[in-house]
Amino acid sequence: MQIQPHPSGALLLLLLSNLLMWENVASVPRCIMENGGCQKVLNYLFNMTSTISESFNTLSSETLNDFYTEFDPHQTFQNRPAMTCHTSSRSIPNNKRKAERMEPAALLNVIIRMLASWKNLLYHVENNMANLDGTPYAIISKVKLIDRQIKKLTKNLQDIKTILSQVHPELKEKENYPVWSGEPYVQKSKRRTQLFGLHSLFFCLYSDAEKVSDYVNILRNKIVPNE
C-alpha cells in the first residue's frame, strides 16, 4: 500500500524547493510568486491558523468563565486584579494598534513566543487543580483541547516562519520564552491563595489567546493581503 503525503506537507515541500531557486533575491517584502506558488501555500496555512486561533480564543474564554462559575461564585477574584501576566513585556504589543505597526517578521516571532510561553499549561492545571474541592474535570478537559490547539498553532506558524525565513534571515534567530510565574501561589496549602494563582493563570491565558487571534489576522493581512 502506497502512503500518500499529507496535502499541506506536499505543498510546503514544493514551495521550499521553489524558494531555494530564488533565495539569492536581496529583498522580497511580500510573497509575490504567482500561478499557485507562495501566495496559495501561505494562504492555506493562514486559513488553518486563523480558524484554530479563533477556537483557542473561544475555549480560553469559556475556561475562564467555567473557573468563575465553579470556584468564584461570589466574584472574589473577578473584582480584583490578577498578578502581572508572565508574557507582559515591552517586546510584546498589548493592543492591536501596536501590533499593526510592527514588521511582519517581528510580529510572527512575537506570536510564536507567546504560544511557547504556554507550553506547560496542561502540567500546571493538572498538577494544581487535582486536589481542589469541586469538579474541575470540565476545566481540565478544555485545557487539554487548548494544549493541542497551542501545539497546532505553533506548528503552522513555524511552517510559515520556515517559508518567510528564506527572505527574512532574522526569523531564524532563536527566542527566549518567559515562563509562568504563578507556581508559588498554587503550591500553597491555603485554598484562597491557590485559587488566586489559578485565576491569574486562566485570566492571562484568555488575554493572550485574544491577542494571538487578533495578531494572527493582522499578520495574515500583512503577508497575504486581499486573499
UniProtKB/Swiss-Prot annotation:
Compartment annotation: Secreted
Keywords: Disulfide bond, Glycoprotein, Hormone, Secreted, Signal
Positions glycosylated per UniProt: N47
S-S bridge residues: C85-C204
Tissues where the protein occurs: Expressed specifically in placenta. Highly expressed in invasive trophoblast cells lining the central placental vessel.
Record-level GO BP terms: cell surface receptor signaling pathway; female pregnancy; mammary gland development; positive regulation of lactation; positive regulation of receptor signaling pathway via JAK-STAT; response to nutrient levels
Secretion signal, residue range per the UniProt entry: 1-27
Location, primary (coarse class): secreted
Cellular component, GO annotation: extracellular space
Gene3D superfamilies in the cross-refs: 1.20.1250.10
GO molecular function ontology, one term from the record: hormone activity
Transmembrane segments: none
Family: Belongs to the somatotropin/prolactin family.
Protein's UniProt name: Prolactin-5A1
Native organism: Rattus norvegicus (Rat)
